[in-house]
Regions:
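Short beta-strand-loop/turn "lid" adjacent to the catalytic site in phosphate-handling enzymes
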Residues: 58-121
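Glycine-rich nucleotide/cofactor/substrate-binding loop typically near the N-terminus or early
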Residues: 22-80, 85
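Short glycine-rich phosphate-binding loop at a beta-alpha junction
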Residues: 93-102, 287-297
Length: 369
């Protein structure tokens, strides 16, 4: 069993999720602790501003000085996060053997065969004096994979930990939503569509950043879904394409919805997330007995209640319902687990999860000298 820290900075750019787990990288896991370190407002703004500038791969070179500056700052914030988590642990922190460092995605495009995360794994290792695994997506993409999603093999571990019956599905509603379907030895995973990103973006635009997200789905409940705009979004070829498949937050344009009032825009994008998830179920045979919701979107009552109403034959639950699981830290826990698998040379991506040519051990490993 190896004790590892996982670090995740998601599409919301709000801060660093950090988790400590102990695992053998295969079947056993102990959840030790979690910690969230928020970004300062100015840094968050600069990070989001950079992401908005990068719409194509050529923009990486164009904005390289800005990227390098932010990468160093982001790495130092991750260092501070680990130090604070170590302090929280006290003497137990000496048992930490490995750090899984995802970094911050600034560009993801399967078409370009590129997925760029900023975060200096070598600097992180040097400053923390810890073994570090980073660059988790690179090897998968270079071998024909989508580079996403990466959490399915961790969902498989959770299924065993929670002793669920087959078939079961985990749906993570982050910036982008993705699904992992498990049935005996079968594992299938793909992005379903937008999660919170479009909802958050239109709220931030229309409120000039006074409101960051739809707390409990309150805005969506007050609005009316524009069915014509919704159907236009759902007509995108992505939704009829067979998995595996992945998305980036820039794959959907929000211009069509800018003319709507705030509540209607939020209701329309929230329903878009719901309908995209429902369409993803068409690729699952047989249907899962249970769907487990993870990620920030599980807290959105509008999305949760709409899914429960429209998907009547499947039990839908939030992962927090189950023993000692905190749904806010699934991805950070996953990257701790993926780091351990990488260290032990066990595959983290598969043809059925990313479309890679073969099961692959991913991630660059930096060992302390």
């Amino acid at each position: 069993m190896i004790t590892a820290i996982g670090l995740m900075s998601g599409t919301s750019c709000d801060g660093v999720d950090a988790s400590i787990i102990k695992t053998d990288g295969v079947k056993k896991v102990e959840f030790i602790d979690n910690y969230y370190h928020p970004y300062e407002k100015k840094f968050r703004f600069r990070l989001k501003e950079l992401k908005e500038k990068i719409n194509q791969f050529s923009d990486i070179k164009k904005y390289r000085p800005d990227i390098d500056t932010l990468e160093r700052e982001l790495t130092l914030i991750h260092v501070k996060t680990v130090e604070l988590l170590r302090k929280k642990l006290g003497s137990e922190n000496k048992k930490i053997e490995l750090v899984g460092f995802h970094g911050q995605t600034i560009f993801h495009s399967f078409k370009d065969k590129k997925s760029i995360q900023i975060g200096d794994g070598k600097l992180l290792s040097q400053l923390l004096n810890q073994n570090v695994v980073y660059n988790f997506r690179k090897k998968d993409i270079s071998n024909g994979g989508q580079g996403a999603p990466l959490t399915p093999v961790f969902h498989q571990l959770l299924k065993n930990y929670l002793d669920f019956d087959f078939p079961v599905a985990f749906i993570n509603i982050g910036g982008i939503a993705n699904i992992t379907y498990l049935n005996n030895q079968k594992i299938l995973s793909f992005d379903t569509g937008p999660g919170n990103f479009l909802i958050d973006s239109i709220i931030q635009i229309k409120t000039k950043n006074e409101i960051q997200f739809d707390n409990n789905g309150d805005l969506a409940f007050k609005g009316t879904v524009d069915k014509n705009i919704l159907e236009t979004y759902l007509d995108d070829p992505f939704f009829s394409k067979s998995p595996p498949k992945s998305l980036d937050v820039n794959d959907f344009n929000i211009s069509a919805i800018r003319t709507l009032k705030l509540e209607d825009a939020v209701a329309t994008f929230s329903e878009f997330t719901v309908q995209a998830i429902i369409r993803s179920l068409n690729f699952l045979d047989p249907l899962p007995k249970k769907i487990i919701l993870c990620g920030g979107g599980r807290k959105n009552k509008f999305i949760f209640e709409r899914l429960q109403k429209l998907v009547k034959k499947i039990e839908i639950q939030k992962i927090d319902k189950y023993k000692n699981i905190d749904g806010d830290f699934i991805e950070s826990q996953a990257f701790a687990y993926l780091a351990v698998r990488t260290l032990k040379k066990i595959p983290i991506t598969f043809p059925e999860t990313t479309g890679a040519a073969e099961p692959l051990v991913g991630g660059d490993l930096v060992l302390v000298k």
